[in-house]
A protein has these predicted regions:
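Gly/Ser/Thr/Pro-enriched helix-cap/hinge segments flanking short amphipathic alpha-helices
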Residues: 23-27, 45, 346, 350, ...
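Blade-edge beta-strand/turn elements of extracellular beta-propeller
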Residues: 28-31, 107-116, 157-167, 231-243, ...
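Repeat-based blade/solenoid architectures
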Residues: 37-58, 93, 115-127, 166-177, ...
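Beta-propeller blade termini
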Residues: 56-66, 101, 122-133, 137, ...
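Hydrophobic beta-strand segments that make up the repeating blades of beta-propeller
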Residues: 72-76, 134-143, 189-193, 264-269, ...
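Short, conserved, GDST-rich strand-edge loop motifs in beta-rich repeat architectures
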Residues: 75-92, 193-217, 374-384
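Beta-propeller blade signature
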Residues: 95-102, 220-227, 278, 388-394
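Asp-box/WD-like beta-propeller blade repeats and closely related beta-sheet repeat scaffolds
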Residues: 111-131, 141-181, 191-215, 219-221, ...
Length: 545
């Protein structure tokens, strides 16, 4: 009996888990090989010996060629003279990032060379956004060392404009969400930076517990880059009130946490205080992490926060946060004036506490209208494999472990890192893409998640080309009210489907679909039929709040 089975049996005996989950649930099928995904992640060496190598990478779904099908981008590591052992020198220059084009038939084609996006740096996170409002998604790659920014040429190729744009941040960057922080109509980018790795410090440190952790090194400040509207960006971090010289950001999340229509920043740091920067609406932010209960773990300790997932877990109209870590994880429920840690009472701690969590996801995998939890797991200091977690939200405030019922994949073990979701086969349910350390990522097709009714909302700015990043969708069907912010950068170093997915259960239509645009004007649609991708374009006559 595995650890998961033993713990689950114990939990059942002491009645911590509610009534058994119905057996007719969706399953996930590992289609990696059949889909043609063969790019293996590498940390650029033959032995895992330091934190640069062990941090891993994320993964991204995005439609780079505007054909309506989600493509895949995978950052990779490299052999680095300041990081890697000399034994790995033969890998130098041989490792690249990979772009897979979705063929629309369940398979993907490697188009990295044709698209000219095969960066050879030490890659971690990636994100895509239409920074120049020309209708196609541009690509930003976070590296250990200079970051890379590719402008989409609209013909299937990209051009490296890193230096000219001012976005070649030379620090150790992990994540980069895009949003219009100042309301001027173009997208800015927040770059989450990690720590100042010292290649000579602890170089020969090989304790049984593994290489030194993040607190052995100095932190690095993050950066907010303002889009100047001319193809260049300016660092406005200090002026915006965001400068924290000793942060150790593992990722960055943008969402509206206080329902004022402005996008805030939540920054999970590694082993120290986390930041919640509330948007003041005047181009400035203030850190209220401590006041809101977001700075530390339930015991007042700094936790090894990985990639946070955001969503309205209890359907009360306020965005909650789930943060995986090396312990039990943290489910932080938004109580308007503060956040309450409900990890233990929801059953998440019992299951997630067995593993080291990295890529956390809140998504409605079964289409019943309630957000479920997926976590990609893997040891932080060794290549020890772990099972991933899938917990179903039963709608009563409890999560039920359904992993072993959800397909053979969940009986296997990997060294998981980033994870994301998206409907890559356009069948109405959410599929998974899981990045693994020093291994091939796994593409997991959701089979049966569309048995319930669903609605996918594709939000566009005037003209219908660019995604309306930062908009909020509220879908009402009967007594169930769901909200979602259109921010595709989510979880650990990853980006997912930019469309907002809503499970409607047995409802054949949504009573209302309300869109609050980034400028806080609104559009309301009524009696919207289920089982469709609804494209909503911002009209000039949208009603102002």
């Amino acid at each position: 009996m595995s650890m998961r089975q033993s713990i689950s049996a114990l939990v059942l005996m002491v009645s911590l888990v509610p009534a058994a989950v119905a057996e007719d649930l969706p399953t996930f099928t590992d289609v990696t090989v059949a889909a043609g995904i063969r790019a293996k992640h590498s940390y650029g060496d033959f032995d895992l010996s330091n934190i640069v190598e062990g941090t891993g990478s994320g993964a991204m779904f995005f439609d780079y060629d505007n054909d309506g099908w989600l493509d895949i981008y995978l950052p990779n590591g490299c052999w680095h003279p300041d990081v890697s052992d000399n034994r790995g020198r033969r890998l130098r220059g041989r490792l690249t990032n990979t772009l897979y084009r979705n063929n629309g038939d369940g398979t993907f084609t490697d188009v990295t060379k044709q698209a000219k996006v095969g960066d050879t740096g030490f890659g971690y996170g990636c994100s895509a956004a239409d920074f120049d409002a020309d209708g196609d998604l541009d690509l930003y790659v976070c590296n250990y060392g200079p970051n890379v920014f590719y402008r989409n040429n609209g013909d299937g190729t990209f051009t490296d404009i890193s230096k000219d744009s001012g976005l070649a941040d030379a620090r150790w960057s992990l994540s980069a969400p895009w949003f219009d922080y100042d309301g001027d109509g173009d997208l800015d980018v927040y770059v989450a930076n990690y720590l100042e790795y010292d290649s000579g410090k602890f170089r020969s440190f090989y304790a049984a517990a593994g290489y030194p952790g993040p607190l052995s090194y100095s932190g690095q400040p993050d950066a907010l880059y303002r889009n100047n509207g001319d193809g260049t960006f300016t660092d406005v971090t200090k002026g915006a009130g965001l400068h924290q010289p000793n942060g150790r950001a593992m990722s960055a999340t943008v969402t509206d946490l206080n329902n004022d229509g402005l996008l805030d920043l939540y920054i999970p740091n590694d082993g120290m205080e986390n930041y919640f920067f509330r948007n003041l609406g005047n181009g400035k932010f203030v850190n209220e992490g401590l006041e809101m209960g977001l700075a530390f773990g339930e015991g007042g300790q700094g936790v090894s926060s990985m990639g946070p997932a955001v969503g309205d877990v209890d359907r009360d109209g306020w965005i909650d946060i789930y943060v995986p870590d090396m312990g039990y994880g943290c489910l932080l429920m938004n109580r308007k004036e503060f956040f309450e840690d409900r990890t233990a009472s929801t059953n998440l701690a019992v299951v997630c506490g067995q593993y080291t969590g990295w890529g956390g996801i809140l998504f409605d995998y079964d289409g019943d209208g309630y957000l479920d939890v997926f976590v990609g797991n893997g040891n932080a200091h060794h290549e020890y494999t772990e099972e991933d977690v899938l917990m179903r939200n039963d709608g009563t405030g409890t999560f039920v472990d359904v992993a072993t019922k959800s397909g053979p994949y969940f009986h296997e073990k990997y060294v998981g890192r980033g994870a994301t979701y998206g409907d890559y086969d356009n069948d109405g349910d959410l599929d998974l893409l899981v990045a693994n350390l020093n291994a091939i990522p796994r593409l997991l097709r959701n089979d049966g998640g569309n048995k319930n009714h669903w609605l996918m909302v594709d939000l566009r700015l005037p003209g219908g080309k660019s995604h309306a990043l930062g908009a909020r969708v509220t879908v009402t069907s009967g007594t169930l009210v769901q909200i979602q912010d259109a921010i595709p950068v989510r979880g650990y170093l990853s980006q997912g489907d930019p469309r907002c997915h809503f499970g409607l259960g047995q409802a054949e239509r949504a009573d209302t679909v309300e869109v609050r645009w980034p400028d806080r004007t609104t559009t309301v649609l009524k009696e919207v039929r289920a089982n469709q991708v609804l494209k909503v374009v911002k009209p000039s006559e949208a009603k102002e709040l």
